[in-house]
Amino acid sequence: MLPHGLIVSCQALADEPLHSSFIMSKMALAAYEGGAVGIRANTKEDILAIKETVDLPVIGIVKRDYDHSDVFITATSKEVDELIESQCEVIALDATLQQRPKETLDELVSYIRTHAPNVEIMADIATVEEAKNAARLGFDYIGTTLHGYTSYTQGQLLYQNDFQFLKDVLQSVDAKVIAEGNVITPDMYKRVMDLGVHCSVVGGAITRPKEITKRFVQVMED
């Protein structure tokens, strides 16, 4: 089980300056030394490097684009197999109701339970309906990861209206809820923890220096 506390997302995509499994492992080490209780990471290679560097539970994902589907976070059994090989403690996958490129969400959950019974599963959702569906399927954790990042939730931010969407999710499911997406300040982190989430994932505000720099520069340009 993931501990209560701060999970730091250590990810850099291929077009980003810090794209490197070695660099991500050092980013994870910095997070560990700062008090993080877990890491969220993308790709088998990054996860293996991170697990060699820090003794923390890892939420693993594989981001891969597919034609004719907007689902890209651990979209098929191929990505699941890569994550099982990485020996991450938790596999996270897109649990939205969008059209998937291959297996159904139900089939992927069954696949993970069969092939990796000791691995926990996290649902990345965008709506309360999707949270309820994930709970019905037996996900161990339900994360607000994709709220604001789908075509039908675009422009919505987790912290709007004092985290009302997060409150709605917490009231709708019995599963452990993870706050993720636009938790961008220590005060926001404290607020979501006080609301009763199991843990919170923070990424860009900690591990994306290019984006952090842009925010400082943008203030003067505005």
From Swiss-Prot:
<comment type="pathway">
    <text>Amino-sugar metabolism; N-acetylneuraminate degradation; D-fructose 6-phosphate from N-acetylneuraminate: step 3/5.</text>
</comment>
<dbReference type="GO" id="GO:0005829">
    <property type="term" value="C:cytosol"/>
</dbReference>
<comment type="similarity">
    <text>Belongs to the NanE family.</text>
</comment>
<comment type="function">
    <text>Converts N-acetylmannosamine-6-phosphate (ManNAc-6-P) to N-acetylglucosamine-6-phosphate (GlcNAc-6-P).</text>
</comment>
<dbReference type="Pfam" id="PF04131">
    <property type="entry name" value="NanE"/>
</dbReference>
<dbReference type="GO" id="GO:0006053">
    <property type="term" value="P:N-acetylmannosamine catabolic process"/>
</dbReference>
<keyword id="KW-0119">Carbohydrate metabolism</keyword>
<protein>
    <recommendedName>
        <fullName>Putative N-acetylmannosamine-6-phosphate 2-epimerase</fullName>
        <ecNumber>5.1.3.9</ecNumber>
    </recommendedName>
</protein>
<dbReference type="GO" id="GO:0047465">
    <property type="term" value="F:N-acylglucosamine-6-phosphate 2-epimerase activity"/>
</dbReference>
<keyword id="KW-0413">Isomerase</keyword>
<dbReference type="InterPro" id="IPR007260">
    <property type="entry name" value="NanE"/>
</dbReference>
<dbReference type="InterPro" id="IPR011060">
    <property type="entry name" value="RibuloseP-bd_barrel"/>
</dbReference>
<dbReference type="GO" id="GO:0019262">
    <property type="term" value="P:N-acetylneuraminate catabolic process"/>
</dbReference>
<dbReference type="InterPro" id="IPR013785">
    <property type="entry name" value="Aldolase_TIM"/>
</dbReference>
<dbReference type="GO" id="GO:0005975">
    <property type="term" value="P:carbohydrate metabolic process"/>
</dbReference>
